[in-house]
């Protein structure tokens, strides 16, 4: 597995360099807009909480930990304002699903690092259970590639984005190709959604990558492209097939 990882990196950097030189992919002009002012919507406690408890990952493969702990702390805060936030180390010690902690190590679990979409969903469910948090449902959604604009999967995602932004009745954790959204490597990545503007159809990402210093906004089409990207076949050996999202319906 280490040999395979070493072979993947040159390919990823060559693809990154190509997009940078040609101005394609996420290097196209006006594709990403940085959000400089934090969002504090008093009418939407859940949205306010996810912005407050959003944290950055502690190393290159731990985007799942930062994303899940951000959501768990946001949900916990709604029931008890005095709740002390859970740390990323705490949740890794408490939730052992899928050898989560081992997957965050340098060598990974049997050479596998990070969490594919189905395993991310299991980790979210077990994290909610571990901290005795009741939600209506947890939905693991794969986003098929080459869907037309009227596909039910796209329509449902837009509906859930609107519901989150207007009413705060659910959180969305995206599992996406990061290089489709921002100028970086085309690798599987995980981060929570922070907002959705239904008028402009733009999605705000609370990216847990510490290199993304501020939240950023992309069009819904760009967001969906990142979700529906079939990860390069070299990632299949590590369990990564395609992207999608986890929807935590809280009410």
Question: Model regions: which residues?
Answer:
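Enzymes acting in ubiquitin/UBL processing and closely related pathways
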Residues: 2-25, 235-251
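Conserved active-site-adjacent core of cysteine acyl-enzyme catalytic domains
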Residues: 95-188, 194-227, 231, 235-243
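Short low-complexity stretches enriched in small and charged residues
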Residues: 18-29, 90, 157-165
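Polar/charged alpha-helical tracts
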Residues: 2, 6, 89-93, 155
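Short amphipathic alpha-helical patches
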Residues: 70, 77, 229-232, 247
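Cysteine-nucleophile protease catalytic domains, especially the papain-like/related folds used
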Residues: 17, 27-152, 239-242
């Amino acid at each position: 597995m280490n040999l395979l990882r070493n072979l993947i990196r040159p390919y990823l950097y060559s693809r990154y360099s190509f997009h940078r030189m040609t101005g394609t992919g996420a290097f196209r002009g006006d594709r990403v807009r940085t959000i400089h002012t934090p969002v504090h919507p008093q009418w939407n406690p859940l949205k306010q909480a996810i912005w407050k408890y959003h944290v950055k990952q502690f190393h290159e493969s731990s985007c799942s930990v930062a994303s899940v702990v951000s959501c768990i702390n946001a949900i916990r805060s709604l029931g008890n304002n005095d709740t002390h936030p859970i740390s990323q180390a705490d949740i890794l010690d408490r939730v052992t699903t899928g050898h989560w902690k081992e997957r965050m190590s340098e060598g990974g679990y049997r050479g596998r690092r990070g969490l594919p979409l189905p395993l991310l969903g299991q980790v979210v469910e077990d994290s909610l259970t571990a901290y005795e948090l009741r939600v209506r449902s947890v939905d693991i959604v794969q986003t098929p590639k080459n869907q037309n604009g009227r596909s039910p999967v796209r329509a449902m995602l837009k509906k859930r984005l609107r519901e989150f932004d207007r009413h705060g009745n659910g959180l969305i954790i995206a599992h996406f190709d990061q290089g489709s959204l921002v100028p970086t490597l085309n690798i599987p990545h995980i981060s929570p959604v922070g907002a959705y503007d239904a008028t402009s159809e733009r999605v705000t990402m609370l990216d847990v990558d510490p290199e993304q210093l501020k939240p950023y906004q992309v069009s819904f089409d760009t967001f969906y492209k990142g979700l529906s990207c079939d990860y390069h076949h070299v990632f299949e050996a590590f369990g990564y097939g395609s992207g999608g999202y986890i929807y935590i319906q809280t009410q």
